[in-house]
Amino acid sequence: MLKREMNIADYDADLWRAMEQEVVRQEEHIELIASENYTSPRVMQAQGSQLTNKYAEGYPGKRYYGGCEYVDVVEQLAIDRAKALFGADYANVQPHSGSQANVAVYSALLKPGDTVLGMNLAHGGHLTHGSPVNFSGKLYNIVPYGIDESGQIDYEDLARQAEIHKPKMIIGGFSAYSGIVDWAKMREIADSIDAWFFVDMAHVAGLVAAGVYPNPVPHAHIVTTTTHKTLAGPRGGLILAKGGDEDLYKKLNSSVFPGNQGGPLMHVIAGKAVALKEAMEPEFKIYQQQVAKNAKAMVAVFLERGYKVVSGGTDNHLFLLDLVDKDITGKDADAALGRANITVNKNSVPNDPKSPFVTSGVRIGSPAITRRGFKEAESRELAGWMCDVLDNINDEATIERVKQKVLAICARLPVYA
């Protein structure tokens, strides 16, 4: 018999110590990785529930196992909420991750060797949009598109590439692009060559849900997203569509299960259902509006201090610092800021002279700091501290001074009060 008072602390001290150290790290460090966020205790409650015990291969009402009457309710709640939140008429909440959702789309629509137009990773795309080290770049013929000298997507070049290469699918979406994507324009280009238009909105899903960023669902044939990042739910994936036929939706479902996954993670799907409900609250819209304001506030400080921001600004939750002119590598900037308890990630910039393991830039995002209560004033102050570190990257005294300021503001604005 299992006893509810069983706990990790009494049983596995080594594991518990690492878990507790991570709790301290999250509370005492400022998190600026654009893809990270803090999920609510309600989501964590769902993920730690007895739903983790249940196998449920198949879909609500069509399971391969018995005893699924209650997990059917859980999954249907998640499906219905996803459709309502994003204005879709189809949703699959089973993908274990955003990458798994993307795998399912590729598998449903394409054959190996088909041509795909995707955003260049160095210009802000994602691994699953055609990187040669990823399944997408290995199995499909990838033609990359990118940004122009102003840092905006070059739609003329995209249209030209589409006309020349006649891809079966065009991918919209990004992991490090700070502009507004013209989804309607991309759909127009896709329609001109009879291609699928697939959008990966993983980074901006929360902004989209709150009406702060344009919704791709009315324009794309298929949309995928993660359920964490700006959406602030559990780590997982989601597939959405609107206006498609039942044959397409059946292909997508079959591509997820049994095509690429087995049993769904019902405890995570419950977490998705909670997060989707939270995203419908008025407070969530206020949060997302503040995310965008904080990112803009930080950009203004970096520009004032003489730092180059790719595209010159941001219209979402993230931006890229280009450090080429400062003769600082992304790797060194990442490490120095880390010693000041400020967490970022090194990132390639357009025409980067450095390797992806070194890079010439850092990516900065505002979802996590906004979640813990930062407003524009704190965001500007933080950006100033970061400039102090980068201006004196080898001065440990400066780094230590900034670290003490970081610890103070983290104590004032805890993640979990």
From Swiss-Prot:
(6S)-5,6,7,8-tetrahydrofolate binds at residues 121, 125-127, 355-357. GO terms for biological process: glycine biosynthetic process from serine; tetrahydrofolate interconversion; tetrahydrofolate metabolic process. SUPFAM superfamilies: PLP-dependent transferases (SSF53383). The gene is glyA. It comes from Yersinia pestis. NCBIfam families: PRK00011.1. The keyword Cytoplasm applies. It catalyses: (6R)-5,10-methylene-5,6,7,8-tetrahydrofolate + glycine + H2O = (6S)-5,6,7,8-tetrahydrofolate + L-serine. It holds the Pfam family SHMT. The record marks 228 as: Plays an important role in substrate specificity. This is Serine hydroxymethyltransferase. HAMAP family: SHMT. Its EC number is 2.1.2.1. Homodimer. Catalyzes the reversible interconversion of serine and glycine with tetrahydrofolate (THF) serving as the one-carbon carrier. This reaction serves as the major source of one-carbon groups required for the biosynthesis of purines, thymidylate, methionine, and other important biomolecules. Also exhibits THF-independent aldolase activity toward beta-hydroxyamino acids, producing glycine and aldehydes, via a retro-aldol mechanism. The modification N6-(pyridoxal phosphate)lysine is found at residue 229. The lineage of its organism: Bacteria, Pseudomonadati, Pseudomonadota, Gammaproteobacteria, Enterobacterales. Belongs to the SHMT family.
